[in-house]
Amino acid sequence: MIWRLCKQCIAVDEHALNRRRVVQGLLAAALPLGTLSCGKGSGGMATGEPLVVGGLPVTCNLTLPVACVAKARSNGALAAGQPRFEYRYSKYSGWPEVKESLMAGRIQAAYMLAPLVMDLADRKVPVKIVSLGHRSGAVIMVRTDSPYQTFRQLAGKQIAIPSRFAVDFLFLRKMLAQENMTPADIHIVEMAPPDMPAALYANAVDAYCTGEPFGAAAQQAGYARPLRMTRDEWRNYICCVLTVREELIQQNPAMVQDLVNQVLGAGVWLDQRQENRSKAVAIAAGRDFFNQDPKIIQFVMENPVDRVTYGDLRMIRAEFEELMQLSIAAGTIKHAIAYETYMDETFAKNARAAAISL
């Protein structure tokens, strides 16, 4: 059974409460007050109009801030008459908000959870996946002073997940299957990722499974360590994918192609050298993007360097099929969905990684 656990439900002493406030302060941007204002016309449908791209302040979305800034700089070097595209990042507090904005057409593009896009497309929402945004980047965290050395030792323990729709939950299920365990062997609670580090510190949960930087926040603070990481267990892990509405594909395919090129270029650039990752941290930590403590994002980039990767953004059909089957087994997708229903490979096949100069 999956229970929802809110931060008001976590019983902590005064010291733990103060520690929670510190951790949440470091990650304040992960709970933004709202999205940047963007009307229905801000999707980049008109010539010369910026394309608003929704995303969350998580490292799985790091290629997006890099792409936005790099494109703005390259526009300044274009000769008169050359097509200019502009991309504007819009920060959201959670996947439901991104989903609603994309469904309503308030935004035309966003980084989304891959299984969620599959489900939306199956329900006739006109959206398509056009690129990956990253690989890997999920962790299962336990307290540093806990006795847990193997995943099986978590049997009977309370483990937090963002939601049953999150790909992190599929990662947890893969680890259960690896040990011949089922979700019935543990106690699963749903919890907002920004609350997870404090909940672990307060012993309100025994472990949590989520994406970065919420694992790194507790690890850097010294009271948590990763028990399992996708880099070791599921290297081709896919969570966030670049998704666009079909009317944008139909009305401005050149813009979609350029955006895919920019994201691909950002991924290559991020994985080329550590210096580039540090530059990306400085960009993403700013108020226009994640608005987070740069030390935590930098920790994700270095410990280890392949904790999250961006250089291999190939869209491989078999990987999406595996993700779908895992989602069906988890009950978040009800039936098999044709690959072509949610995927448009055209832009990835024609992609040329943009040169990133930052």
Model regions and ranges:
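Secondary-structure end/capping motifs
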Residues: 250-335
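Conserved C-terminal helix/tail region of periplasmic/extracytoplasmic solute-binding proteins
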Residues: 323-358
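Short, glycine-/small- and polar/acidic-enriched structural segments
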Residues: 45-182, 187-190, 206-212, 223, ...
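Pocket-lining segment of extracytoplasmic ligand-binding domains
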Residues: 115, 146, 195-288
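N-terminal secretory signal peptides
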Residues: 1-18, 26-32
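Solvent-exposed, polar/charged alpha-helical surfaces in well-ordered, non-transmembrane soluble domains
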Residues: 100, 104, 118, 152, ...
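Solvent-exposed, acidic/flexible segments
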Residues: 57, 91, 95, 165-169, ...
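C-terminal motif of bacterial Sec signal peptides marking the signal peptidase cleavage site
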Residues: 36-37
